[in-house]
Every structure is written in structure tokens, then in C-alpha cells.
């Protein structure tokens, strides 16, 4: 197998195939489920708004891929600082049947100097997720934090509060995942010695097989070549799938999103 194809297949199996658009419909979510069962293998998960979870669960089961996980979003996309609302949304997502919850960290509170709000919000959501055996990913919105020190601090707080993954971005702001931010976040995981428990998810702007290969190379270099499995690494993306299928020698799939 060629190295290019090998890398593409590896990345495909680490995708959270995503649609988080205001105009999402049942038909679009069903199409996303079909795309997640690709000719080159299944993506790790799909990521959708909570209200579509029951439909997605039914579709994945009927197409013979119940193992594809369902991720959703809470406190999304603005990262407000009300822990009660974030917790209520997270509990509702769990009740809908989510396997994984991607919660937005209250990044503006951190930028204003308040570290406690983020810790308490993530801790509360983690407790709800732990009780339901649901994975918690924390979106720090790195493109808004901008400064390396804030990106590192948000990552540390999320990890200390129990995050199973730290995730770069919502995909709803001007700057989303970048290799520079990925390196900071991956090195934070390494520095805290939590690579067994905590994973990393770049999201937004990861569109090509070459992009994906660059992020995986970073993970391999910083945390070891065997670290980036589906429990420790995901890509939040939609248009990436077509590029990966093309690189792997399959006809490209289409996507309505540019996430």
C-alpha cells in the first residue's frame, strides 16, 4: 500500500464527520450517515446537532453501522459562562443518546481573567458524562484565544477538570485549527503526562489529505507513533472526507459543508 493511501485511510478512521449548519435537515443528516459508511471504511463518528441524534441512531443502525459513534455539541458555539445552562444542555444531549459531547469552554471568561468558571463548567459536564459513559470533548476556541499562553491555560484547565479530549475550535469563527495551535495543545497533553487519558481534536479548516497528514505527523512526533488512535485523536471535518477518499484511490464523496 502506498504511503499516501495509508495515511489517508488512517485519517479517515479518525474523522468526526460533521454537519453543524443552521440549515441542517433530516435529509442532510441521513446523507451524512451514509457518507460515514464510506467505501474505504467507516469514520470514527458523526457530529451533529442534538435534535438529530435519534434519527442518526436509527439510520446508522439500519445501514449496518451501529458502531459509528454519535457526537454532538453543547454550549455551542458561543462558549457562554453559565455552567447551569451548559450542564442542562449536556444532560439533554445525553438523554437524546449522544455517545460523545463536544462542549464549548467559556473562553471569553478566561480572556477576562476568570479561570474558575471554565473549570467548574467542564467539571460539571464531565460528571454528567461520566455517569452516562459518554466521552467529553472540550472546545477551547483557540482562534479567539489567539495567545499561546491562553491556549495553553485553557487546555490545562479543561484537562484538570476532566476533559477526555481537548478540541481546537467550533468552526464558527474566523480562525480555526492550525498546526501551530495543535503543537501547543499536543505538548500540553505531553507536559501534563495525561496522554493515556486525554485526546486531541483539530476542527475547522482541515480540508485536505495533506492537512490531515500534517496533524498526524505532529501527534506522532510529540506523543509517539501509536498514540493517535480513535480514542486519542479525531478530526472535526466534513469536506476532508472527499479528499481522503481521493487520496486513498476511491471516488470522492460530496459534502454540503465546508467545516
Curated annotation (Swiss-Prot):
UniProt-listed InterPro entries: Aldolase_TIM, DeoC, DeoC/FbaB/LacD_aldolase, DeoC_typeII
Metabolic or biological pathway: Carbohydrate degradation; 2-deoxy-D-ribose 1-phosphate degradation; D-glyceraldehyde 3-phosphate and acetaldehyde from 2-deoxy-alpha-D-ribose 1-phosphate: step 2/2
Catalytic reaction annotation: 2-deoxy-D-ribose 5-phosphate = D-glyceraldehyde 3-phosphate + acetaldehyde
Subcellular location: Cytoplasm
EC numbers, comma separated: 4.1.2.4
Alphabetical list of SUPFAM superfamilies matching this protein: Aldolase (SSF51569)
Active site: 102, 167, 201
GO terms of biological process kind: 2-deoxyribose 1-phosphate catabolic process; carbohydrate catabolic process; deoxyribonucleotide catabolic process
Pfam families associated with the record: DeoC
GO cellular component, one term: cytoplasm
Molecular-function annotations in GO: deoxyribose-phosphate aldolase activity
Gene3D superfamilies, A to Z: Aldolase class I
EC top class named in words: lyase
Domain of life of the native organism: Bacteria
TM ranges: none
Main location: cytoplasm
UniProtKB keywords: Cytoplasm, Lyase, Schiff base
Function as written in the Swiss-Prot or TrEMBL entry: Catalyzes a reversible aldol reaction between acetaldehyde and D-glyceraldehyde 3-phosphate to generate 2-deoxy-D-ribose 5-phosphate.
Family matches, as PANTHER family: DEOXYRIBOSE-PHOSPHATE ALDOLASE (PTHR10889:SF3)
Entry similarity comment: Belongs to the DeoC/FbaB aldolase family. DeoC type 2 subfamily.
Protein name, UniProt field: Deoxyribose-phosphate aldolase
Annotated organism of origin: Erwinia tasmaniensis (strain DSM 17950 / CFBP 7177 / CIP 109463 / NCPPB 4357 / Et1/99)
Amino acid at each position: 500500500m502506498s504511503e499516501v493511501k495509508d495515511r489517508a485511510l488512517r485519517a479517515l478512521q479518525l474523522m468526526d464527520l460533521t454537519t453543524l449548519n443552521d440549515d441542517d435537515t433530516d435529509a442532510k443528516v441521513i446523507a451524512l450517515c451514509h457518507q460515514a459508511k464510506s467505501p474505504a471504511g467507516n469514520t470514527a463518528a458523526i457530529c451533529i446537532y442534538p435534535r438529530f441524534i435519534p434519527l442518526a441512531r436509527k439510520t446508522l443502525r439500519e445501514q449496518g453501522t451501529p458502531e459509528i459513534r454519535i457526537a454532538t455539541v453543547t454550549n455551542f458555539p458561543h462558549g457562554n459562562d453559565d455552567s447551569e445552562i451548559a450542564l442542562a444542555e449536556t444532560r439533554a444531549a445525553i438523554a437524546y443518546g449522544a455517545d460523545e459531547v463536544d462542549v464549548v469552554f467559556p473562553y471569553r471568561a478566561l480572556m477576562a481573567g476568570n479561570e474558575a468558571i471554565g473549570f467548574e463548567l467542564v467539571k460539571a459536564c464531565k460528571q454528567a458524562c461520566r455517569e452516562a459513559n459518554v466521552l467529553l470533548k472540550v472546545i477551547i476556541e483557540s482562534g479567539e484565544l489567539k495567545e499561546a499562553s491562553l491556549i495553553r491555560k485553557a487546555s490545562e484547565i479543561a484537562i484538570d477538570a476532566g476533559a477526555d479530549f481537548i478540541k481546537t475550535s467550533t468552526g464558527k469563527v474566523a480562525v480555526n485549527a492550525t498546526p501551530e495551535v495543535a503543537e501547543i495543545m499536543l505538548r500540553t497533553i505531553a507536559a501534563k503526562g495525561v496522554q493515556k487519558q486525554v485526546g486531541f481534536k483539530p476542527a475547522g479548516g482541515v480540508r485536505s489529505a495533506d492537512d490531515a497528514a500534517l496533524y498526524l505527523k505532529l501527534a506522532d512526533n510529540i506523543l509517539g507513533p501509536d498514540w493517535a488512535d480513535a480514542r486519542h485523536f479525531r478530526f472535526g471535518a466534513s469536506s476532508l472526507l472527499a479528499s481522503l477518499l481521493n487520496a486513498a484511490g476511491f471516488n470522492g464523496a460530496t459534502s454540503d459543508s465546508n467545516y
